Amino acid sequence: MTAEKKYSNGLQLLATFVWSKSIDDSSQADWNVSWLGSIDSLQDPNKPWLERSLSTFDIPYVFQLSYSYDLPVGHGRAFMGNMPRWADLILGGWKTNGVWRMSDGRPLTFTLSDGGQPLPTYGSQRPNLVGTPKRNHGADWVDNYFADPNVLQRPAPFTLGDAPRAVGSVRSPSHFTADLSVGKQFHIREEMNFEFRVEAKNAFNHPVFGTPDTAVGDDTFGTINYTSVGPRQLQLGFKFNF
């Protein structure tokens, strides 16, 4: 779904919302992205249909808002249009742009910490589900991501676990970022100008946490030890157009 405000009064907006669901039996789409999985993740070669589950890249909700806004200050604009030339050179003619993105997380894939049992399988062996995995919403969720980690159990000897390839009842943390910029063109003469920009990636320095350890039996099971988006980055840009 898309909503757009075409450029008027210095403002242009574009908002998109995606609601989707992806199901497959092998999620690899890029050999360079290992977490997508592949035929190598087939747990039981005699029952390949058990691999059918949510795609490991399934993200149900994605909202994105982008905008471009000419600040209404300076010559030819709504406010302070009669300011002296030197003041307009500093205060007038600025433009800001931004992209805001919010999305749900991906379903989690659970494995066994030691690789599982000596059985003829192609890929990682999975645990048993004795309940529904849920996320811990307490203050300690980064160190204890799962509300009840005991709903994931190691299978009995010489058996394979019944957990699906991707579990949708618990997902990786949601995603929120805002990339913003502000800039101005300084006109030198006709068809010649100098452009200055300040850009901020993850402008609000909002932490986007990565996926918790999902290997049942690990000492760090349920712990998140990295972020998937870096801290705020500021960048200055200069461009001479002619």
Q: Where do the language-model regions lie?
A:
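Short, solvent-exposed micro-motifs at the edges of structured domains
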Residues: 1-242
